Regions:
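Short coil/loop linkers at secondary-structure junctions
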Residues: 34-36, 91, 179
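Conserved catalytic alpha/beta cores of large enzymes that bind or transform nucleotide phosphates
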Residues: 186-234
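Active-site-adjacent bridging/hinge elements
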Residues: 2-4, 36-47, 137-145, 200-210, ...
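Hydrophobic, Leu/Ile/Phe/Ala-enriched alpha-helical segments that form helix-helix packing faces
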Residues: 29-33, 71, 193-196, 269-273
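Common nucleic-acid-contacting/processivity interface regions adjacent to the catalytic cores
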Residues: 50-54, 58-176, 223-264, 268
């Protein structure tokens, strides 16, 4: 076979870059962590003079030191990876996407996803091609983008309210039943995270067939669990609109309906607030 042997990846235990939620090069990590930086100006496809071997070794060692420092600085990500691996019966070497897919869909590799036409929920919404030749999410005369709609009126304001919508994108995904029969599994992840935030240990103990119970006695580990569930929630709705094919992307979802639903709601809310 000319293809890769999948299990060969598990010759390693994990990949720091993969489990880190911050995706950047080792050099940038080193700078941010205040580590010593060392370059080696020799060509790697040519023999190195013996009098420079020690310098080459120092260069390689420097990368190891920075990798260890990155691991220590991303311990919360690592704890989350271990928890997701345990919940799914997979390994810490599996990617976050693989772990979350297993947590939601189990062994089903072709789940039947549900696409919702949001023009039925928000009359007047259009996925429309404009003069630039590209399609845009248009609603009430505005391009609301692909999610994350922002509106502001310049000025100085006092005595203002700061309001937040909890878990807007995950809630949209659940309300649209995007994952079909597996939507409940995703909803359970959200409910478990909320229960942890509210200290509702009794509710958590009955979820995921009791797999979470071992984490409930230690507040520090409970915090790691909450972070693991947050990663599962956030990585999921990103995959629904990814540019590449994956188990969570519906082929019709070119307009990013999970984030779009929230943007359409906020644009509707804008008009209602301005009426007051």
């Amino acid at each position: 076979s000319g293809g890769p042997f999948r299990e060969a990846y598990n010759l390693s235990y994990t990949d720091v870059y993969d489990f880190s939620n911050v995706k950047q090069g080792l050099k940038k990590f080193g700078i941010e962590l205040g580590m010593h930086h060392q370059e080696f100006g020799e060509r790697w496809d040519q023999p190195v003079d013996e009098n420079k071997w020690e310098m080459a070794a120092q260069y390689c060692a420097n990368d190891v030191y920075i990798t260890e420092a990155v691991f220590n600085s991303r311990k919360a990500d690592w704890a989350a990876r271990l928890i997701l691996a345990e919940l799914t019966g997979m390994t810490p070497n599996n990617s976050t996407n693989q772990l979350v897919s297993k947590l939601i869909f189990g062994e089903d590799r072709n789940p039947q996803l549900v696409y919702t036409d949001l023009s039925e929920t928000f009359p007047g919404y259009e996925w429309k091609q404009l003069s630039d030749g590209k399609f845009h999410n248009m609603y009430r005369g505005d391009d609301v983008g692909m999610g994350g709609y922002v509106y502001a009126e310049p000025g100085i304001y006092t005595n203002v309210a700061l309001l937040d919508i909890a878990s807007m994108h995950p809630t949209s995904l659940i309300n649209m039943n995007y994952f079909g029969k597996y939507t409940k599994n995703y909803a359970d992840i959200k409910e478990a995270r909320i229960a942890i935030k509210h200290g509702d240990i009794k509710k958590i103990s009955g979820m995921f067939d009791g797999k979470l119970n071992k984490y409930l006695g230690d507040p520090a580990i409970l915090s790691d669990l909450a972070f693991a569930l947050k990663i599962a929630l956030n990585s999921t709705y990103g995959l629904t609109s990814a540019r590449f094919d994956n188990i969570m992307k519906h082929p019709k979802n070119v307009n990013n309906i999970v984030a779009l639903r929230g943007a359409l709601f906020m644009r509707t809310l804008q008009d209602e607030v301005q009426k007051q």
